[in-house]
């Protein structure tokens, strides 16, 4: 499985979950009903909420996704890791911003990953490839 396929699989799993968006009176009322029934409600991002079950599933899906990438790094699967870095660099317009933080966040890492010499070499290869492919 390449990175794009992994990401699409992750997205399908996330899309199967039930989230509430508290942007309308109806959904705010639903949140209050859950709380009144002593159910835990979690704020997951940008006005989205999940009950305990969906929150736990989201965390598990995310952990599985990130662990898959970590294992590919541990295995030194250059094709997969370079493809993942390239994909996220493209997704976050890295050639313009040169903001590694957004790319790393999408992959489940922070700047500490650059302490891994092998990863840094693969990052550099993906960056060079992207810059040569980019339509300036």
Residues of each region from the PLM?
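Soluble, non-transmembrane alpha-helical interaction regions
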Residues: 1-136
């Amino acid at each position: 499985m390449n990175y794009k396929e992994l990401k699409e699989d992750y997205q399908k799993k996330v899309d199967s979950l039930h989230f509430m968006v508290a942007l309308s009176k109806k959904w705010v009322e639903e949140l209050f009903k859950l709380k009144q029934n002593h159910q835990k409600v979690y704020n997951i991002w940008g006005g989205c909420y999940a009950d305990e079950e969906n929150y736990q599933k989201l965390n598990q899906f995310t952990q599985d996704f990130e662990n898959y990438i970590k294992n590919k790094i541990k295995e030194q699967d250059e094709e997969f890791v370079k493809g993942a870095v390239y994909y996220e660099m493209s997704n976050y317009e890295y050639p313009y911003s040169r903001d590694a933080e957004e790319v790393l966040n999408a992959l489940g890492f922070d700047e500490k990953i650059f302490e891994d010499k092998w990863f840094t070499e693969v990052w550099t290869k993906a960056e060079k490839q992207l810059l040569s492919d980019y339509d300036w």
